[in-house]
Amino acid sequence: MRVTICLTAALAVCAASTPALAKTAKPAAFQLNETTWTFVDKGVKVRESIDASGNYIENAVNGKHIDHGAAVMKGQKACFTSAMTKEGEVCWTTPRYALKIGQSFVAKSDKGEKLRVTRVKYLPLKM
């Protein structure tokens, strides 16, 4: 009987003292491809989608086309080059990690402009 109790106690101690080795999952890095964002720019509510190839389309929520071009991540910045203007590349700060749908952040451009951007469900846009 004593052997059974000691053996049971030893097994319980071993089972309870095993450290949890599961590592905490590292959050995914921020990415642009296949994402859609909403924001208000100069009083216009805008929806912007970036496809898998890094092409973006920016439309007013009412459907009016505003801009399109190429988007690329450069470090912690999202950089956009419009196919419609001669402004050149404009880069904005981004969070370090991916945002879930419904989450927002304030992006700051290289020119010092600030914009509150909200991630929404991916919606491929067409011109």
Regions found by a protein language model. Give the residues of each.
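Positively charged n-region of N-terminal signal peptides that target proteins for export
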Residues: 1-4
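Lipid interaction determinants
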Residues: 8, 17-68, 74-127
